[in-house]
Amino acid sequence: MTEKMVETAPPGFELLPQGLGYTDTLQPVYRKVEGDSAIFGLVVGTQHSNTMGICHGGVLMTLADITATTGANLAHGVASGSPTVHLSIDFIASARQGEWLQAEAEHVSVKRRFGFSSGGIYNSAGAVARFSATVYFPDHQGMWKDGRRGDGLLKRQEEG
């Protein structure tokens, strides 16, 4: 019997800290922030898979959402607090357990109170999904009663 090879996070990626709400359900999730770009990734595990043994579409949607929003936040100069108001995704190929998935926001623009982000999710064979998102940059504190906005997904692990 042969063992299935499990890919690992490439060099330069750090584990996303716990305590970020729903994103914690994807753990372990990794990120690499360089300048004004952020890349997120994960190794597809059983917790990410559907009954066919491939990565669940909801996992891909969540990975697209955090990548698109973080890309827009970086372009706008804020760390978090910007809700996604639109997200569309095209599923192109499957990703199997043990494969490294990497999500990248490739085109980001900011217009007034909105950020627009599009990109892709890839495995070693190529594109798994393409996404497009619109993010709203509120001019108020929203639901946060104590006045904080937080630093969300951009918070460095060594600071937390």
Each predicted region: which residue ranges?
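Terminal targeting signals and extreme-terminal segments of soluble enzymes
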Residues: M1-G160
